[in-house]
Swiss-Prot record:
Keywords: Cell cycle, Cell division, GTP-binding, Magnesium, Metal-binding, Nucleotide-binding, Septation
Task of the protein: Necessary for normal cell division and for the maintenance of normal septation.
Domain of life of the native organism: Bacteria
The family this protein is said to belong to: Belongs to the TRAFAC class TrmE-Era-EngA-EngB-Septin-like GTPase superfamily. EngB GTPase family.
Residues annotated as binding Mg(2+): S39, T61
Name of the protein: Probable GTP-binding protein EngB
Any Pfam family matching the protein: MMR_HSR1
Family matches, as Gene3D superfamilies: P-loop containing nucleotide triphosphate hydrolases (3.40.50.300)
GO terms, biological process: division septum assembly
GO MF, one example: metal ion binding
Cofactor(s) required, per the database record: Mg(2+)
One Gene Ontology term, aspect cellular component: cytosol
UniProt cross-references to InterPro entries, sorted A to Z: G_ENGB_dom, GTP-bd, GTP-bd_ribosome_bio_YsxC, P-loop_NTPase
Species in which this protein is naturally found: Staphylococcus aureus (strain MRSA252)
Length: 196
């Protein structure tokens, strides 16, 4: 699958169902804890530096951001979870917004769950993965920040994450580095069956 990086736009930032875009395109949602690198991942996948706004401040994305990717699919950037400085009320609001999207949106075909390859999955990562499995949502786990791990230890870290998430054998896990930028095609190939 090839995408034209010049044909990508943020369609809408939504907080509730009646704001979701009316479209026939399949949607791929990106979930992960705050600061796992969702925006950086989107930018590197589409070959654009600042399409999805990256921030040094975790918990910055507070809406569901719908990006039309070359009229082929829509990436939905979901607010990061597990950020301590977001108030309890705000966290509950995010939770409801994410739940409404994941359980009601028929266009949703796949969730890419991003986890940090350097660390064990957090309790929130495990809860999110189990939540997706509970609703039978196809899930692709991407382990970010691969460049921060010595090459010889990458497989060990992947195996650890797979075990701790108690991953469904049908789900795929891939390590990724937005800096090395060498696995986009592999990931597009994994996404493609869900959107065609």
């Amino acid at each position: 699958m090839k995408v034209n990086p010049n044909n990508i736009e943020l369609i809408i930032s939504a907080v509730k169902e009646d704001q979701y875009p009316e479209t026939e395109l399949s949607e791929v949602a990106l979930s992960g804890r705050s600061n796992v690198g969702k925006s950086t991942f989107i930018n590197s996948m589409i070959g654009r530096k600042n399409m999805a706004r990256t921030s040094q401040q975790p918990g910055k994305t507070q809406t569901l951001n719908f990006y039309n990717i070359d009229e082929q699919l829509i990436f939905v950037d979901v607010p990061g979870y597990g950020y301590a400085k977001v108030s309890k009320t705000q966290r509950e609001k995010f939770g409801k917004m994410i739940e409404e999207y994941i359980t009601k949106r028929e266009n949703l075909q796949l969730v890419i769950q991003l986890v940090d390859l350097r660390h064990d999955p957090t309790q929130d990562d495990i809860l999110m993965y189990n939540y997706l499995k509970h609703f039978d949502i196809p899930t692709l786990v991407i382990c970010t920040k691969e460049d921060k791990i010595p090459k010889g230890k990458v497989q060990k870290h992947i195996k650890n994450i797979k075990t701790q998430l108690d991953m469904d054998p049908d789900d795929t896990i891939v390590s990724y580095s937005s800096i090395q930028n060498n696995k986009q095609q592999q990931i597009w190939n994994l996404i493609e069956p869900y959107i065609s």
